[in-house]
From Swiss-Prot:
GO terms, molecular function: calcium ion binding; calcium-dependent protein serine/threonine phosphatase regulator activity; phosphatase binding; protein phosphatase binding
Species of provenance: Dictyostelium discoideum
Entry's Gene Ontology cellular component terms: calcineurin complex
Binding site for Ca(2+) 2: D70, N72, D74, E76, E81
Protein name, per record: Calcineurin subunit B type 1
Length: 180
């Protein structure tokens, strides 16, 4: 099965070039990396294959990141999904796209809002046992109160942008150099 995925055809390359900020040479390089990560040669990446990357394996939000990569929600990352997310996180990605990606990390149920419970879950992933649940809930409550401008009990994307969009260096913090 892995053989049928060994080459990108010209049409696929052109489509990905049109839909991303990557050149043909960059796409070919990314495809070679993708194939190296695809240990079983299936043409897709599984969570376990992502976890085999030492730098990513330690990331407490890796499961959420993988869920966002997996746009069609089939529990596998196809190359086009891989490219789409990497394009967002590359230095060529727009600030708005990067902030949408970050918002998606917190918006676990994909309803367009960050609820108190979702914020708690994501922060719990990040802090682990460094804070107890009461301390963490206090931070969550304070964040929701400060960021919920329309007072509906949740954070919309616009409110999220208002809260963090103007932080100095946010775009750089959400950029990864994939060309190395």
């Amino acid at each position: 099965m892995g053989n049928q995925h060994s080459l990108l055809n010209k049409e696929q390359l052109e489509q990905m070039k049109d839909n991303s900020s990557f050149s043909e040479a960059e796409l070919k390089k990314l495809y070679r990396r993708f194939q190296m990560l695809d240990k079983d040669g299936s043409g897709t990446l599984t969570t376990d294959e992502f976890l085999s990357i030492p730098d990513l394996a330690l990331n407490p939000l890796l499961e959420r990141v993988i869920q966002i990569f997996d746009q069609n929600k089939d529990n596998e990352i196809e190359f086009f999904e891989f490219v789409g997310t990497l394009a967002t996180l590359s230095h060529k990605g727009t600030k708005e796209d990067k902030l949408k990606f970050l918002f998606q990390i917190y918006d676990i149920d994909c309803d367009g809002f960050i609820s108190n419970g979702e914020l708690f879950q994501v922060l719990k992933m990040m802090v682990g046992t460094n804070l107890n649940d009461v301390q963490l809930q206090q931070i969550v409550d304070k964040t929701i109160i400060e960021g919920d401008y329309d007072k509906d009990g949740k954070i919309s994307f616009d409110e999220f942008i208002h809260m963090i969009g103007n932080q100095e260096g946010i775009e750089e913090k959400l950029s990864v150099n994939w060309s190395e």
